[in-house]
Swiss-Prot record:
Belongs to the PNP/UDP phosphorylase family. A purine D-ribonucleoside binds at H5, E180, M181, E182, S204, D205. PANTHER family: PURINE NUCLEOSIDE PHOSPHORYLASE DEOD-TYPE, URIDINE PHOSPHORYLASE. Homohexamer; trimer of homodimers. It comes from Actinobacillus pleuropneumoniae serotype 3 (strain JL03). This is Purine nucleoside phosphorylase DeoD-type. The active site is at D205 (proton donor).
Length: 240
């Protein structure tokens, strides 16, 4: 049952998919955290895998950069492969002084400067929020594992190299915890097609101080975020 962007057969994906932006991070997650892993798709080198975590079938697949890219993959996974839950596991930038590099953020909502959701929602503002039960499970997973995690709003930007640097002051005033490029789109796609979604991000760089992690570190570490995501799936299963 291939789509234009996914060449996996029917039934290849689990009902829960972790989605990093980087397909190599998807490969890392599959090889490091999952057992009995099988690669199920590789169109455009956007790798997807299915395996098990503590006996629970889970998939992981990259979604690329930006709302247009992640929206394509999220939509096809939900409508063509029956995926019920998507957990974005990605990086973000910080603007607040009290948010530090490598902090983990659970995105309960996502503001955006993108017009994608206005197009989808007939020129009205859509409140892009995570699924409550998934958010609660992630918070519980973080506490059980002793991992400090913040919960709050993300900002999904259309431009990585923004000309409007003063907007960072506004974000800080409004308490934005992290700036990334996808969560608002994934939340809206999930809402449109009756699925559930959550974004968990690790701060990879601080926009104010200039402190940053390397591309290799972003690809091969950030294990706390991944652990929270995987453990939250198990907690969610018990709650259902």
């Amino acid at each position: 049952m291939a789509t234009p962007h996914i060449n996996a057969p029917e039934g290849a994906f689990a009902d829960v998919v972790l989605m990093p932006g980087d397909p190599l991070r998807a490969k890392y997650i599959a090889e490091t955290f999952l057992e009995d892993t099988v690669q199920v798709t590789d169109v455009r080198n956007m790798f997807g895998y299915t395996g098990t975590y503590k006996g629970r079938r889970i998939s992981v697949m990259g979604h690329g950069m930006g709302i247009p890219s992640c929206s394509i993959y999220a939509k096809e996974l939900i409508t063509e492969y029956g995926v019920k839950k998507i957990i974005r596991v990605g990086s973000c930038g910080a603007v607040r002084q009290d948010v530090k590099v490598r902090d983990v953020i659970i995105g309960s909502g996502a503001c955006t400067d993108s017009k994608v959701n206005r197009i989808r929602f007939r020129n009205n503002d859509f409140a892009a929020i995570s699924d409550f039960d998934m958010t609660l499970a992630a918070v519980q997973a973080a506490k059980q594992k002793g991992i400090a995690a913040r919960v709050g709003n993300l900002f999904s930007a259309d431009l990585f190299y923004t000309p409007d640097v003063e907007m960072f002051d506004v974000m800080e005033k409004y308490g934005i915890l992290g700036v990334e490029m996808e969560a608002a789109g994934i939340y809206a796609v999930a809402a449109e097609y009756g699925a559930k979604a959550l974004a968990i991000c690790t701060v990879s760089d601080h926009i104010r101080t200039g402190e940053q992690t390397s591309s290799e570190e972003r690809q091969l570490t950030f294990n706390d975020m991944i652990t929270i995501a995987l453990e939250s799936v198990l907690i969610g299963d018990k709650a259902e």
